[in-house]
Amino acid sequence: MARTVFCRKLQKEADGLDFQLYPGELGKRIFDNISKEAWGEWQKKQTMLINEHKLNMMEPNARAFLEEKMSAYLFDDVEPTIEGYVPPEK
């Protein structure tokens, strides 16, 4: 049976992640409070941010930038600004 969490991003009960995907305290917080669906949405945004800003994930500054955007998106409901991207109507 799938593990469920109350997803802070989607504000509903949903399937939780199968295992902690991100290290550290932030990773534990994501595992405990974010659903698979919300994590998948973040991965799409993350890919767009990496491409738009031409981030090299080997650089600590690039990882810190993405971590900041990830935390804001998942927990503070802050949509990352991606030039030229218009979110679909809900």
UniProtKB/Swiss-Prot annotation:
GO terms for cellular component: cytosol. Transmembrane segments: none annotated. Gene3D superfamilies: Fe(II) trafficking protein YggX (1.10.3880.10). GO terms for biological process: cellular response to oxidative stress. Keywords: Iron. InterPro entries: Fe_traffick_prot_YggX, Fe_traffick_prot_YggX_sf. GO terms for molecular function: iron ion binding. The keyword Iron applies. It comes from the Bacteria. Signal peptide: none annotated. NCBIfam families: PRK05408.1 (NF003817). Could be a mediator in iron transactions between iron acquisition and iron-requiring processes, such as synthesis and/or repair of Fe-S clusters in biosynthetic enzymes. HAMAP family: Fe_traffic_YggX. Belongs to the Fe(2+)-trafficking protein family. This is Probable Fe(2+)-trafficking protein. The lineage of its organism: Bacteria, Pseudomonadati, Pseudomonadota, Gammaproteobacteria, Alteromonadales.
